[in-house]
Each structure stands twice: as C-alpha cells, then as structure tokens.
Amino acid sequence: FETEDGPINVPVTFLCSGFGVVENPDHVIGSSLRRSNSLLYLIGHTEDEMGGSVFARTHGVEDGKVPQTDCAANMELYKAYYSALTSGLVLSAHDISEGGLAVTAAEMAFSGKGGVRLDLTKVPTVNGWKSPAVPLFSESTGRILVEVDPEFAADFETAMDGFPCACIGSVTEEKRLTATCCCLLYTSPSP
C-alpha cells in the first residue's frame, strides 16, 4: 500500500473463517452487554500464558508460556455452552482472545448499557498465577465471557456443570470497568 510517506506493508496474516446454517435465528446473540445488573460468567481456564500476548509485547516481556489449545476439551466445553445458549440462558457472549479478559470486558461494555465489575479471585484456573495481570491479560485459548440474567444463573450453572465456569462479575449501571484481585482494586477513569 503506497502513501505519501512511502509504502506500508501488511504482515502476512492467517485467516480462517467458518460458515454454517443457523437453524433458529433466536439463537443468534451479540457480544454487547444487554442490561445492567446481569451476571458475567467466564467459561474455560485462565492460565499464566502471557507469551506472545499484547501485554507481553506492550511491556517488553520476551519470555512466558505461549497459550496451549486443547481442541477436544474446548469442543466439549463449547457443546455445553451451545446447550445453554439454545436453551435461552445467554444474553450475550464474547470470546476472550487478543488483549485478554480486560479487553473483552471493555469491548462488551462499548454498547453503553453499563459498566463491568470483575472479581479476579473467581477466575477459573488450574495452575494459578503470581501476578494480577495474568487473569486480566492472559490470552489462554478457548474462553468465553458470558452475560446471564440472574433469573437464569442456576440453570446456566447446571448446564455448565463439570466444566470450568464461574461467575466472575456483574454488569453495573455506572459506565466503568472495575477489577478486584485480593486487596488490589483498579477502576477505570470516568468517561
């Protein structure tokens, strides 16, 4: 691509798209928050897998474990999630990928329906982590942040029984992103 300042080269990028038949359009949901006072569930494990992440690049971290993907485990997790979705238990959902949980929560809140309060001590993990940056910015694969109406919380938890799933927060009326981890608290500045 040529500009006045010279050429701009786009790095080679692998893109994989999937297509399928939507049997029931009522099962199609968006990624924007739907209402305040709803609950936020994280499905999938968050591990200390910061290698190659946006956080690592931004902070000059050159080592760190690169996220590993367990396709078989993720498929079973997604089947349980799909069952909850098609049962009408999910208001909205967003995959957690580049930028981690913090970026995903912020993207969901862009709808203007409210803010997000997260309790990082509730984030599902197998091996834990030493830094509060990990649950916020890890790019562990296979995870989804799911908005659920409190009325359907018990049903959603039943649908996800046996899988890594925890209520890690809620949607607030105040348009802020707040994350707590033990005694640490971070609140985004007012808009």
Spans of model-derived segments:
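Conserved small/polar residues in nucleotide/adenosyl-binding loops
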Residues: 186-191
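Beta-strand->loop->alpha-helix junctions that form or flank phosphate-binding loops
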Residues: 96-97, 108, 114-126, 157-182
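Gly-rich Lys/Arg/Thr-decorated short loops/hinges at beta-loop-alpha junctions or inter-strand turns
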Residues: 54-66
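Active-site-proximal betaalpha loop/short-helix elements
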Residues: 66-141
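Short, surface-exposed amphipathic charged segments that create phosphate/polyanion-binding patches used
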Residues: 134-136, 180-184
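Phosphate/diphosphate-binding loops
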Residues: 1-46, 127-174
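Short, Lys/Arg- and Gly-enriched loop/turn segments at beta-strand edges
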Residues: 47-54
